């Protein structure tokens, strides 16, 4: 699907904000399974994944990462830290909006990518669990009842209806 672009100009700040979304193709699996990995398993302090998951700096951006007390998922602002298959992108820090068939949405920030050897031919989902989204969590804060699948929690319950890649930046006018 083509990009949708919104431009706004503030007469006070002389800044143009550009927001672009691109809806990406979905695999044939439902994406209902939403697995997780422990964020502290990423130990290479020089890696982009480590920077995003641990309040580091990558490509000139410093991330302020926290753990959501309700879900145990690592977060950067309003974005849940997650891995996707390389079909959806490989640049750490890329942001996405996921819409479920229940109408609920949640936002994720790419902190890691699934290994191509563990994904389908198009690299959209993990072959073993058929998961599209894999959250990064604090192992000590996973809620009871998750049992390996965040689809069991209300905010994430449902099949994936769409994934949109988000781009947002501010540019000062000259």
Question: What is each PLM-predicted segment?
Answer:
Residues 21-174:
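Solvent-exposed, well-ordered loop and adjacent helix/strand elements within mature globular domains
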